[in-house]
Amino acid sequence: MAVYRKKISPIKPTEAVDYKDIDLLRKFITEQGKILPKRSTGLTSKQQKKLTKAIKQARILSLLPFLNKD
């Protein structure tokens, strides 16, 4: 029987997710510019929703690209 361990959230529950913190947001985006899913990041549902909104807001304000064209 396999034992599964709960992933520890990389963002502390007290830490605020802000659209201006580009370095933090880039950790949760793939090379193509897609937002990583909750199951691979280890975030809680609340944190994932806040992160998604922050990434989308940063994209609209041109702080992050919609697509990475490399």
From Swiss-Prot:
PROSITE patterns for the chain = RIBOSOMAL_S18
Listed GO cellular component terms? Answer: chloroplast; mitochondrial small ribosomal subunit
Any one Gene Ontology MF annotation carried by this entry is:
structural constituent of ribosome
Among Pfam families, the record links this protein to:
Ribosomal_S18 (PF01084)
Q: What is its main location?
A: plastid
Q: Which InterPro entries match?
A: Ribosomal_bS18, Ribosomal_bS18_CS, Ribosomal_bS18_sf
Key words, A-Z: Chloroplast, Plastid, Ribonucleoprotein, Ribosomal protein, RNA-binding, rRNA-binding
Localization annotation: Plastid, Chloroplast
Instruction: Please name the GO terms of the biological process aspect recorded for this protein, alphabetically.
Output: translation
> What stretches pass through the bilayer?
none
Q: What HAMAP family does this protein map onto?
A: Ribosomal_bS18 (MF_00270)
Q: Which family does it belong to?
A: Belongs to the bacterial ribosomal protein bS18 family.
Assembly description: Part of the 30S ribosomal subunit.
> What's the name of the protein?
Small ribosomal subunit protein bS18c
Give the organism, scientific name. Answer: Porphyra purpurea
- Whichever gene encodes this chain, its name is rps18
